[in-house]
Amino acid sequence: GLWFGPRIGKRSLRMATEDNRQAFFKLLEAADALKYYYDQLPYEMQADEPETRVTKKVIFTPKLGRSLAYDDKVFENVEFTPRLGRRLADDMPATPADQEMYRPDPEQIDSRTKYFSPRLGRTMNFSPRLGRELAYEMVPSKIRVVRSTNKTQST
């Protein structure tokens, strides 16, 4: 077979354990000597023991226009409309509901609703798109649609 040379990083186990053991002993001796000389220093030059519990210092700054006291929140002169599906607290002012402001008059309800059969007890209250008023008196009852295949215009 072909020989590609020695495998890089491959060492025998016996040599690796002896090398590691010697390096570990040297590290222990160095740490022991360091501790010995550190203890010889005067007390003022020795570092204080670090605290084992790490605490994060939080500085609370309220937002502009707000105060730290929560009991002085006053909702005077504020028109508050809750989100859809939420209810207002009793002490907050309420704006009239949309159903009360835009309730259609009985004569405005279209007579076409009887043409739609209600499903599951529903009634059809037809309302045009916002900003549009439908006037069916102006629409002719019979509309004639003519299409020309030879591009002649009908009048």
Curated annotation (Swiss-Prot):
Intracellular or extracellular location(s): Secreted
A molecular function (GO) term: neuropeptide hormone activity
PROSITE patterns per UniProt: PYROKININ (PS00539)
Keyword Transport among UniProt keywords: no
One GO term describing the cellular component: extracellular region
Keyword set includes Kinase: no
Modification Isoleucine amide, positions: 8
Sites of Leucine amide modification: 64, 84, 120, 130
Protein name: PBAN-type neuropeptides
First-listed, main subcellular location of the protein, grouped into a coarse class: secreted
UniProt lineage: Eukaryota, Metazoa, Ecdysozoa, Arthropoda, Hexapoda
Keyword terms: Amidation, Cleavage on pair of basic residues, Hormone, Neuropeptide, Pheromone response, Secreted
Other remarks on this protein: Juvenile hormone seems to allow PBAN release, which then induces pheromone biosynthesis.
